[in-house]
């Protein structure tokens, strides 16, 4: 399987990965909008106890917010530095999130795991084959649940 990865995007995020949890840094806009996004998802679905997949999790901002609302979160990203930052922050905050360095396509091929909710926020514009990402994200869903894409 060809990896659906834009190496320039991976390199860009690797360079600034240490800034994920700085609310005044490169990711300030995400820090501002993240509580709104997490609350919106929770209001629509009541995520407590649900299995949530966060595709393109970055440093774990959304993953931790949904974990705090009681979701069982698996979060994936293709940038090793992002996963490292996310894991360190989760350990510091004593939260239990399953972070994985893998693409959505690879996760489907390896595990065929199902999730109640899939969040793919600010990700699709960073991949070369957007249709492939969309198709593979939808494979994870149980019937009659929601998927959130945000460009």
Predicted segments with their positions:
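Soluble or luminal CAZymes and related metallo-dependent hydrolases
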Residues: 5, 33, 37, 129
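Generic alpha-helical secondary structure signal
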Residues: 7-11, 28, 39, 81
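A short secondary-structure junction motif
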Residues: 20-23, 48
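Conserved SAM-binding loop
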Residues: 38-45, 50-151
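Flexible, glycine- and charge-enriched loops at secondary-structure boundaries
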Residues: 6, 27, 31, 76
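N-terminal, positively charged/glycine-rich alpha-helical extensions of SAM-dependent methyltransferases
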Residues: 1-21
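Conserved SAM-binding loop and adjacent beta-strand
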Residues: 22-41
């Amino acid at each position: 399987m060809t990896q659906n990865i834009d190496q320039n995007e991976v390199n860009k995020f690797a360079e600034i990965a240490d800034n994920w949890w700085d609310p005044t840094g490169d990711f300030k806009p995400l820090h501002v909008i993240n509580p709104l996004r997490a609350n919106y998802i929770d209001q629509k679905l009541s995520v407590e106890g649900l299995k949530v997949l966060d595709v393109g999790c970055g440093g774990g901002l959304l993953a931790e917010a949904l974990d705090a609302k009681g979701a069982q979160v698996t979060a994936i990203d293709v940038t090793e530095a992002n996963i490292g930052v996310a894991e360190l922050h989760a350990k510091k905050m004593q939260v239990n999130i399953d972070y994985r360095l893998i693409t959505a396509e690879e996760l489907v091929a390896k595990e065929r795991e199902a999730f109640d909710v899939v969040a793919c926020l600010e990700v699709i514009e960073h991949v070369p084959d957007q249709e492939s990402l969309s198709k593979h994200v939808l494979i994870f869903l149980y019937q009659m649940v929601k998927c959130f894409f945000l460009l």
